[in-house]
């Protein structure tokens, strides 16, 4: 079975749903695809995932933003960005256009975070490392594996549907 909720569900729902799916179907592979912001909505559930021995794979798309919110602000609100940059600090300049080399380091380090829970963490920064990351994650059936994909800050997640619109008005490009 496949279940896709992208932009049709509550932010942060994917990870706890994946835990439930794995507990209900322990012999089936379960993959959760989530963003860095959404994952942090229920990050404490990593303790449940570890103590229950779920070998789920979490594909965490890290763009240093609340990406879906930023994407809606870009596409539907004239690029008027508000409260979406996860590297923003009070010391950032007022006209900052988002993460750059002057920004503080992004926290948390998801690989270290996974390891601190007793789970596994892998960071992917180059496309050619994807297959090896999934091969490694498949080996871990005793605890979750976070595969953190470092992606461009302005990468759009498509297809998507504007809030309140029907699926027939899906944006494809």
Features from the language model and the residues they span:
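Short, small-residue-biased leader/transition segments that mark boundaries at the very start
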Residues: 1-5
């Amino acid at each position: 079975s496949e279940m896709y909720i992208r932009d049709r569900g509550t932010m942060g729902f994917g990870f706890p749903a994946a835990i439930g799916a794995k507990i209900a179907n322990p012999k089936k592979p379960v993959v959760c695809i989530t963003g860095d912001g959404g994952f942090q909505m229920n990050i404490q559930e990593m303790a449940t995932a570890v103590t229950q021995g779920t070998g789920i794979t979490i594909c965490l798309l890290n763009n240093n933003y609340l990406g879906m919110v930023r994407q809606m602000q870009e596409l539907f609100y004239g690029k008027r960005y508000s409260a979406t940059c996860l590297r923003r600090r009070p010391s950032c300049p007022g006209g900052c256009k988002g993460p750059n080399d002057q920004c503080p380091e992004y926290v948390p380090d998801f690989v270290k975070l996974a390891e601190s829970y007793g789970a596994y963490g892998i960071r992917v920064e180059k496309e050619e490392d994807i297959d090896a990351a999934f091969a490694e994650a498949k080996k871990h059936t005793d605890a979750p594996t976070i595969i953190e994909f470092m992606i461009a800050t302005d990468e759009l997640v498509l297809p998507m549907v504007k809030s309140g619109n029907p699926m027939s008005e899906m944006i494809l490009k």
